[in-house]
Amino acid sequence: MQNQKIRIRLKAFDYRLIDKSAVEIVETAKRTGAVVKGPVPLPTRIERFDVLRSPHVNKTSRDQFEIRTHLRLMDIIDPTDKTVDALMKLDLPAGVDVEIKL
């Protein structure tokens, strides 16, 4: 697998989970002899929702909620077969979405 790179994109609502997962991936890749660029924090996406507090009156009284989606980007350059096998066996937390591109 020479002259290749694996791009890993992590997405989660909790920044602690995503940072812990990124450290795990970097340690695993470095242990198997690959070069890692990142993790690079991408802009956090914030979705805000306004909900009426009362079902009947008081239009000006509202609750505000938000969801923050945190993103991290990593590149693994010149991965070996051991690197790919180790990344496949890696057990990450349930709240982290992993997107891998070769």
Curated annotation (Swiss-Prot):
Involved in the binding of tRNA to the ribosomes. This is Small ribosomal subunit protein uS10. GO terms for cellular component: ribonucleoprotein complex; ribosome. Part of the 30S ribosomal subunit. One of its GO terms (molecular function) is structural constituent of ribosome. It comes from Nitrosomonas eutropha (strain DSM 101675 / C91 / Nm57). Coiled coil: none annotated. Keywords: Ribonucleoprotein, Ribosomal protein. InterPro entries: Ribosomal_uS10, Ribosomal_uS10_CS, Ribosomal_uS10_dom, Ribosomal_uS10_dom_sf. GO terms for biological process: translation. NCBIfam families: PRK00596.1 (NF001861), rpsJ_bact (TIGR01049). The keyword Ribonucleoprotein applies. PROSITE patterns: RIBOSOMAL_S10. Belongs to the universal ribosomal protein uS10 family.
